[in-house]
Amino acid sequence: MLRWLADAGLLCVVKAVKGQAVLATLDDVVFHKGVKLGDIISIYAEIQFVGRTSVEVEMKALRGNELIANAYGSYVKVDRNLRPLKIEEIIEPDDQEIWNVAMRRREERLQKIKDRNERRFDVTNPTIGFRYIITNSLNVTPDLTYNGVTASAGRILKIMDDTGGILCLNYIGYPYSNGHVVTAAVSRTSFYSPVMLGDYILIRGCISYVGRTSMEVTLNVIKYEPQSGITEHVTTTYFTFVHIDENGKPIPVKQYSPETDEEKKEYERAIQRRKKS
């Protein structure tokens, strides 16, 4: 689902700006309903605001008229060297109120990522000191790219989702326990460095919070460029998974108590994040 949302937003932007674009930030994603095998899902993307080089897009997943998931994304028009490119196309708002809300959302986001250049080179491992961890690494092959050059943000998000889900399955003791896990939400995800064909990416994850039926996983992605030897931070975000039974109903997760200093600090930060959501 994450990949569908991200890719739908990209296609919408590429068509509107008549050029290449990349996903810069995916705002809080909320999954309202579960999806079963055989369900027919429609993905919609709508431009809500256009800046000098960036576009704000709302993405929705619907089953009939039922809202399954929604998200907001910020995409940047870029040249062949992935440098921001001015949007020449004039796009007038259909709804001025929606336009203004999207503009404020963009301004708020930009305030929170003023240090994005510093974050780009922060490759600190956030899983050190945690007991429940997972790592996943892969080489970026053509099937993981949009155009044979730039890695698809949607595909990276899908791999992150799968990695976090596996960690949660391990935590609940699958396959020796009842139930499965589903993705319930993804926090704001900003991409600090582009991933290119041939790069290696490393995904590091840890369980940072456990509630009655849910688990929060911190997921950090770094990339390694084999030709230059440079390692950069791609993104760090939080996925929330819910433990469900065979009927899709939430069921309790085994009790969790933070033990290490790192776990205790992150647990408190997770509580604050949940209060703000």
Language model features with spans:
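Short, basic/aromatic beta-hairpin or loop at an interaction surface
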Residues: 14-22, 171-182
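Catalytic strand-loop segment that frames the active site of acyl-thioester-processing enzymes
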Residues: 1, 104-159, 163-173, 276-277
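A cross-kingdom feature marking solvent-exposed beta-strand/loop segments within repeated
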Residues: 22-42, 71, 181-193, 202
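Catalytic cores of nucleotide-enabled group-transfer and carboxylate-activating enzymes in metabolic
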Residues: 7-10, 25, 135, 141-152, ...
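HotDog/MaoC-like acyl-thioester-processing domains
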Residues: 36-40, 44, 48-113, 196-197, ...
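N-terminal, Lys/Arg-enriched amphipathic/low-complexity engagement segments
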Residues: 1-9, 14
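A short beta-loop-beta micro-motif enriched in histidine and acidic residues
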Residues: 17-19, 28, 151-155, 177, ...
